[in-house]
């Protein structure tokens, strides 16, 4: 009777729903592993699961007064994590057919994300051979019974959902020692819990996700700031978004690709969300690519309109672009301010109260945004992402990293770069964190000062940018920073060392590609390994395809929710080319993406990048990584610029060419460095050319197309 009354009370107050595979609790041996978000979790499971399980509860909690009061109504067993016999007792209970609930995190979350996973529950599952049923609780964290007051917008009676995921098993790992087997089993359970989180993420559009974040963290919570030093709340950002959307619809149509040539600023964020909510697809243009790069993007994406700012063009010395690129309609934000009418203002006011009614009908799998590749190996390609792929990558990041609304992001990487967009804008907004948008990562003195002044805790950048920030920063500038993540290029040892020595901060290296929105793998404090880029993100499948001549590793191919919808190419304007990749049998598999990168995956799942397939040279039948040649030069001259290319050779098929700005680099010095680093002498170039500067793309990456032409033609210069 008491159970029925309490169940009715909870269902009435919290509108509790239970969904998923609810008929799988009949397994002979069963372990239930929920996430732990509040003190209500145990009561919810006891009341709403269709079975009466035993709860494994730590001894520190079983001795409290309320647990003694609950003992007559709920079966629980005291679990002492320091006593090995406690685990054996749980194994016996499971083997006897008692379903057991174990909270793998061992404590209520204080971040809103998954915390450390204890390996005890996993070892019990592996030892007993029990079915593991992960459960995802959503909603209790918003109550006053959670530990996220001041982090989330708490309320008395939020809606609570209990998601039951499909049962799985944890086979006993193969390892010589019991301790190692426990650790490996724990990592398997961690993977299961992360997959459960990803499986229950709602399918939304970008604008819907922004509204959900506003509801979750509070409409008046500050969320975004730029160089105007005016901090906007979710409500203010929504107001600007509605305003831009109202104006954009005057000269664009639903489904149109709309070019945006804008800096890192709040108005750019509003323009992206504003275009999206009215069914327009923003194409974020690289303002460093020059007129030729812009024209390629315009052709590939079939752009008719480019939205920009006169002030931005003047400050960036880009006023020549509208004159040189005259095949599109240029629209200036400054000119639009005076066109806002009373009707527009009333429309904005109404939809501030009912924002979802401003949206045109859209699906999560519809095209949401177009980014462009750097063009380092040919013409830039338009990369079309859906709402679902962008938001999936955000959730993948949030699943493995413990970002919270207390964090402050410094975002200086351009928003036209996938790294800057997803990690520097969408992730903080969807997490409730504050983000400071700065227009240039090249201001090496200003960025560290702003990190210090705005109390930033999260900083992302390339190895080059982070190395220069360290050179100019005061040792105290990064005192509050707890996450520094490097991506987009290989992390230099010198950069890693100066951050450790000067600031006491370990840089976490990650790996991504524009086609994957972009993060593919990343080291985090909970799972990091030196000389790797971390583990592949949850929800992604990875496979390695053998490449003839390369003994270690293979060509990385990926499939997952964050993969792009497809390419837009200059050669086939406006036509979406869906992703596919050749499998080991040479057959095309749809929805797989071939990164073109040679990587290794170790037994723990950590990924190490060896180089790009296109950046290998074949010398007398042996494959040599051009990046390994560059690393030799960097070891001799860390301050210089170095790039390797290949040229045709009648004797060996191909020969190496090293371009460097350091005239003191010689073949003899390179041979000595190769011997010291265990690099074969075959990887030491005979052709060393000193240049004043390397040819660079607008993104700052070397222009390998031009370098390849220079390698073939000794007379050609930058």
UniProtKB/Swiss-Prot annotation:
EC number: 2.3.1.40, 6.2.1.20
SUPFAM superfamilies tied to this protein: Acetyl-CoA synthetase-like (SSF56801), Glycerol-3-phosphate (1)-acyltransferase (SSF69593)
Catalyzed chemical reaction(s): a 2-acyl-sn-glycero-3-phosphoethanolamine + a fatty acyl-[ACP] = a 1,2-diacyl-sn-glycero-3-phosphoethanolamine + holo-[ACP]; a long-chain fatty acid + holo-[ACP] + ATP = a long-chain fatty acyl-[ACP] + AMP + diphosphate
GO MF terms, alphabetically ordered: acyl-[acyl-carrier-protein]-phospholipid O-acyltransferase activity; ATP binding; long-chain fatty acid [acyl-carrier-protein] ligase activity; medium-chain fatty acid-CoA ligase activity
Compartments in which it is found: Cell inner membrane
Functional description taken from the UniProt entry: Plays a role in lysophospholipid acylation. Transfers fatty acids to the 1-position via an enzyme-bound acyl-ACP intermediate in the presence of ATP and magnesium. Its physiological function is to regenerate phosphatidylethanolamine from 2-acyl-glycero-3-phosphoethanolamine (2-acyl-GPE) formed by transacylation reactions or degradation by phospholipase A1.
CDD domains: LPLAT_AGPAT-like
Keyword set includes ATP-binding: yes
Main location: membrane
This protein's UniProt keywords: Acyltransferase, ATP-binding, Cell inner membrane, Cell membrane, Ligase, Membrane, Multifunctional enzyme, Nucleotide-binding, Transferase, Transmembrane, Transmembrane helix
Highest taxon, organism lineage: Bacteria
Residues of the active site: 36
Positions of region (AMP-binding): 233-646
UniProt xrefs under Pfam families: Acyltransferase, AMP-binding, AMP-binding_C
Acyltransferase: annotated segments: 15-138
Membrane topology note: Multi-pass membrane protein
Plastid recorded as keyword: no
Protein name per its UniProtKB record: Bifunctional protein Aas
Transmembrane domains' residue ranges: 258-277, 409-433
The family this protein is said to belong to: In the N-terminal section; belongs to the 2-acyl-GPE acetyltransferase family.
Annotated GO biological process: fatty acid metabolic process; phospholipid biosynthetic process
Gene Ontology, cellular component aspect: plasma membrane
Organism: Yersinia pseudotuberculosis serotype O:1b (strain IP 31758)
């Amino acid at each position: 009777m008491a159970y029925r009354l309490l169940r009715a009370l909870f269902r009435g107050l919290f509108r509790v729903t239970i969904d998923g595979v609810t008929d799988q609790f009949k397994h002979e041996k069963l372990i239930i592993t929920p996430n732990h978000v509040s003190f209500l979790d145990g009561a919810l499971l006891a009341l709403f699961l269709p079975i009466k399980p035993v709860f494994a509860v730590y001894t520190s909690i079983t001795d409290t007064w309320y647990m003694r009061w609950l003992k007559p109504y709920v079966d629980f067993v005291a679990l002492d994590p320091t006593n090995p016999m406690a685990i054996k007792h749980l194994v016996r209970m499971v083997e006897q057919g008692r379903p057991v609930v174990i909270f793998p995190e061992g404590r209520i979350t204080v971040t809103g994300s998954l915390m450390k996973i204890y390996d005890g529950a996993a070892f019990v599952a592996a030892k007993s051979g029990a079915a593991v049923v992960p459960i995802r609780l959503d909603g209790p964290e918003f109550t006053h019974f959670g530990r996220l007051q001041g982090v989330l917008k708490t309320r008395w009676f939020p809606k609570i959902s209990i998601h039951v995921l499909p049962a799985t098993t944890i086979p006993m790992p193969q390892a010589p020692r019991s301790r190692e087997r426990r650790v490996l089993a724990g990592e398997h359970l961690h993977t299961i819990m992360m997959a459960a989180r990803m499986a229950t993420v709602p399918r939304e559009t970008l604008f819907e996700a922004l509204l959900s974040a506003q509801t979750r963290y509070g409409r008046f919570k500050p969320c975004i700031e730029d160089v105007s030093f005016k901090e906007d709340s979710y409500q203010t950002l929504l107001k600007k978004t509605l305003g831009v959307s109202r104006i954009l619809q005057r000269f664009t149509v639903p489904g149109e690709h709309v070019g945006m040539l804008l800096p890192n600023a709040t108005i750019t964020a509003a323009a992206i969300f504003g275009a999206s909510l009215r069914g327009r697809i923003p194409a974020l243009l690289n303002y460093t690519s020059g007129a030729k790069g812009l024209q390629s993007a315009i052709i590939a994406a079939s752009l008719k309109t480019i939205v920009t700012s006169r002030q931005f063009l003047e400050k960036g010395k880009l006023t020549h672009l509208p004159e040189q690129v005259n095949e599109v309609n240029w629209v200036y934000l400054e000119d639009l301010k005076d066109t806002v009418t009373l009707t527009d203002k009333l429309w904005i006011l109404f939809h501030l109260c009912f924002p979802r009614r401003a949206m045109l009908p859209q699906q999560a799998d519809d095209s949401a945004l177009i980014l462009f590749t750097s063009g380092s190996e040919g013409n830039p390609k338009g990369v079309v992402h859906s709402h679902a792929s962008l938001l999936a990558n955000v959730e993948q990041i949030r699943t493995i990293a413990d970002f919270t609304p207390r964090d402050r992001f410094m975002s200086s990487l351009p928003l036209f770069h996938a790294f800057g967009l997803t990690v520097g804008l969408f992730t903080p907004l969807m997490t409730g964190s504050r983000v400071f948008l700065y227009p240039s990562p090249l201001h090496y003195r200003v960025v560290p000062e702003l990190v210090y002044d705005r109390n930033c805790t999260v900083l992302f950048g390339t190895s080059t940018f982070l190395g220069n920030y360290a050179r100019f920063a005061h040792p105290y500038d990064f005192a509050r920073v707890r996450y520094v993540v490097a991506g987009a290029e290989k992390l230099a040892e010198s950069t890693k060392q100066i951050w450790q020595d000067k600031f006491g901060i370990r840089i976490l290296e990650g790996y991504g590609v524009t086609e994957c929105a972009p993060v593919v793998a990343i080291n985090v404090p909970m799972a990091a390994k030196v000389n790797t880029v971390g583990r592949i993100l949850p929800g992604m499948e990875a496979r390695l395809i053998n490449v003839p001549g390369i003994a270690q590793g293979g060509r990385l191919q990926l499939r997952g929710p964050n993969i792009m919808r497809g390419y837009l190419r200059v050669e086939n304007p406006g036509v979406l080319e869906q992703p596919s990749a050749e499998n080991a049998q040479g057959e095309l598999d749809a929805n797989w993406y071939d990164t073109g990168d040679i990587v290794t995956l170790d037994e723990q799942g950590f990924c190490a990048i060896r180089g790009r397939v296109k950046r290998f040279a074949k010398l007398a039948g042996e494959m040599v990584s051009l990046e390994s040649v560059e690393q030799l030069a960097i070891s001799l001259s860390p301050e210089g610029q170095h790039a390797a290319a290949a040229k045709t050779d009648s004797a060996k098929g191909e020969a190496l060419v090293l371009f460097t700005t350091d005239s003191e680099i010689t073949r003899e010095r390179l041979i000595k460095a190769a011997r010291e680093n265990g690099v074969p002498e075959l990887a030491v170039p005979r052709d060393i050319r000193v240049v004043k500067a390397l040819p660079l793309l607008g993104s700052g990456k070397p222009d390998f197309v031009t370098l390849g032409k220079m390698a073939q033609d000794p007379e050609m210069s930058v």
